[in-house]
Amino acid sequence: IYSKEEFNGIGHGGTEQYGAFSYKPGFAINPLKFVNGIAKYALSKKLKIFEHTKVDKIDKENSSYILRTKEGSIRSKKIVVATNGFYQEGLIPQMDGRVLPVISNIIVTRKLNEDELNAHNFKTFSPIANTKNLLYYYRKLPDNRILFGTRGDLTGSDQSNLAMSKKMEKFLKNIFPKWSN
């Protein structure tokens, strides 16, 4: 747990913080880079990758799972269901009715120079989230851009995305007023 002063001392000087707590270990992940890394590793081991292959059924036999598709079956000792909230009901009964899609909206600033980052004492690469009803999360990217996100609306339409983008820009400027340009 950090006081406001301690939080500022580790490299975050936005206007809305009153302190913080930190998860250890905690990190941010780029899902595309993660899955590309897994694919690269699998290919280096001469494994086959079946993209865009719908699993129709999962059966358990002894200590293995059998994933059944129209094209064939795959046997595995372990499986990971990574759906991003778009789960196929009936595939794993324990998950039915428990997974909801969540739309997230993200904006990214231009590359900020050191003076701009220092204006808000933004030094940390740790991901930061607030605890308000409309949660915001943000982090510094390796090239000094700030990724700023929040939950999206329920429709995900182009019109609502544009409105949400403008709203997010306003929130970002409120938290970091010295970046208002």
List the model feature ranges, each with a label.
Residues 18-77:
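Helical element adjacent to the flavin cofactor pocket in flavoenzyme catalytic cores
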Residues 6-15:
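Flexible hinge/switch segments at interdomain interfaces of large molecular machines
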Residues 14-19, 147-149:
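A short alpha-helix capping/helix-coil boundary motif
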Residues 1-5:
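Dinucleotide-binding Rossmann-like beta1-alpha1 core, especially the glycine-rich loop
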